[in-house]
Amino acid sequence: VNRPGRDSHVLIAALVLLVIALVMPRWKVGREVFDYIVIFDVTQSMDVEDYDAGGTPVSRLNHAREAMRWTLRQLPCGSRIGWGAFTEYRSLLLLTPVEVCENYNDLIASLDNIDGRMRWANASEVGKGVYWSVRVALSTESKPDVIFISDGHEAPPLEPGAPISMPEDVQPGQVRGLIVGAGSDAALPIPKTDDDDRRVGYWSARDVVQLVSPDGTRILSTEHLSALHEPHLKALAGRVGFGYLRLTTPESLAAAMRDARFARRAPAPTDFYWVPLGLALALLV
């Protein structure tokens, strides 16, 4: 019985397997992944602080970004995500979708810079922004799904019952997507910020366009205050064939973005280093 010789062969084999595990490249294997453009409303109503983080008030935009940071860690490798911003009446692509694992740090760094400094106007025509988000997705090579995060606050306000005309080039179901409603049911003052996104006060009733009665004698709205306009966002979602989600916790957003209806079958880099590693450990037991 040549036990020492056998043990040395086992150790050499285990060492070879460990080296293979260390240098083994990732193989592309078909799996369920996701492809998104996430568009953030960066208008001033999104600065309303009606979320709470451990007793500290948090703005709608900051809560949305924090939820997206958490969601990024939940998406499987091979998934792709890009960023966009909505202000005035347009949704603009900021970052074309990239793979989430290889580009995680860059995605986080760019996400942190999506804020009010990107505003070029104080108007907020959310309905038009939703339609533009469809155009953005259609103009992107992979035709990604859309996540549109907004409180639905229209400025200037819409006349009650007035429809938002749908452009001819946008049709229901052209792309898949989800409108995510940010904010609470309570109407709160809208912070006023400068070009560097520094707070300089709050908007007052005389600073903004208000709806008035047909005879011009009564103010019918409080457009200097903002709450989540959920019925409006749900109606917009229905017009373009999107789903709707109210933004509560990061977990709820991650679950919605991992929903099977948004999954795509695509080759994705997959680690198999655990195979030689497991064999090496088995030899050493």
Task: Specify the residue positions occupied by each region the protein language model found.
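Von Willebrand factor type A / integrin I
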Residues: 171-285
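C-terminal signal-anchor/stop-transfer transmembrane helix together with its immediate cytosolic
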Residues: 1-32, 258-285
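Solvent-exposed loop/turn segments at secondary-structure junctions
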Residues: 44-45, 88-91, 152-155, 183-187, ...
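Short beta-strand-loop
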Residues: 80-113, 136-137, 255-256
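Alpha-helical transmembrane signal-anchor/signal-peptide segments
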Residues: 28-44
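Second-shell loop/turn segments in exported
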Residues: 50-61, 93-97, 114-123, 219-224, ...
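…and closely analogous acidic/polar surface helices at protein-protein or active-site interfaces
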Residues: 33-34, 46-81, 99-103
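Exposed acidic/Ser/Thr-rich ligand/metal-binding surfaces
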Residues: 92, 112, 117, 123-178, ...
